[in-house]
């Protein structure tokens, strides 16, 4: 009985942590609160709680991040006021797509694919949005920096994993 109460409390804590976060929460961030329980078991309980009769659902992003999102069947009925974001330039979207499909990729490889040089500002804009991040260095002469997408990229574009990209 005590173990069951403890598990219920852990479920509530994990649920609150995910709910209160503005960004997807990683399994690593949740693990200190599990007190010996399995995260998958806790997540399963939360998913059942937010089944089809709820306005929100727990979404798994990538393989180990979680976020609450509006249930798809009512999303169209909601009209939320948001700060208007300036749309990305065509070049920035093109570079983001190249990074998403070819990651990890170096700046020179991006330029080779595009056939034109890449301005530092384009990378800066994608970094500001937290859609890309450095992924390490190639073991080639000059040790160029490689780029890849982030969890926030997946979240913003409604993807669970990179395999969900079209094409």
Each PLM stretch: what is its role?
Residues 1-14, 67-93:
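Short alpha-helical segments that sit at the start of domains
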Residues 11-21, 85-105, 109:
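Short amphipathic alpha-helical interface segments
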Residues 24-33, 102-114, 134:
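Short acidic, hydrophobic short linear motifs in intrinsically disordered regions
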Residues 37-45, 113-131, 141-144:
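Short amphipathic alpha-helical interaction segments
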Residues 48-60, 129-139:
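A short, conserved structural fragment
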Residues 64-69, 139-150:
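Minor-groove-contacting beta-hairpin "wing" of winged helix-turn-helix DNA-binding domains
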Residues 74-89, 151-167:
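Short, amphipathic alpha-helical interaction segments positioned at domain boundaries
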Residues 123-129, 133-139, 146, 153-167:
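Transcription-machinery-associated regions
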């Amino acid at each position: 009985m005590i173990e069951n109460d403890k598990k219920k409390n852990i479920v509530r804590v994990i649920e609150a942590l995910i709910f209160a976060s503005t960004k997807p929460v990683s399994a690593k961030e949740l693990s200190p609160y599990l007190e010996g329980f399995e995260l998958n078991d806790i997540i399963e309980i939360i998913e059942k709680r937010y089944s089809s009769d709820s306005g929100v659902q727990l979404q798994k992003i990538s393989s180990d991040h979680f976020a609450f999102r509006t249930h798809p069947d009512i999303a169209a009925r909601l009209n939320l006021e948001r700060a208007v974001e300036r749309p990305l330039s065509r070049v920035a979207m093109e570079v983001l797509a190249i990074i998403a499909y070819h990651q990890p990729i170096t700046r020179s490889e991006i330029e080779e694919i595009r056939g034109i040089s890449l301005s530092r500002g384009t990378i800066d804009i994608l970094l500001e949005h937290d859609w890309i991040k450095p992924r390490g260095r190639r073991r080639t002469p000059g040790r160029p920096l490689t780029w890849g997408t982030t969890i926030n990229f997946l979240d913003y574009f409604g993807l669970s994993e990179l395999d969900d990209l079209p094409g």
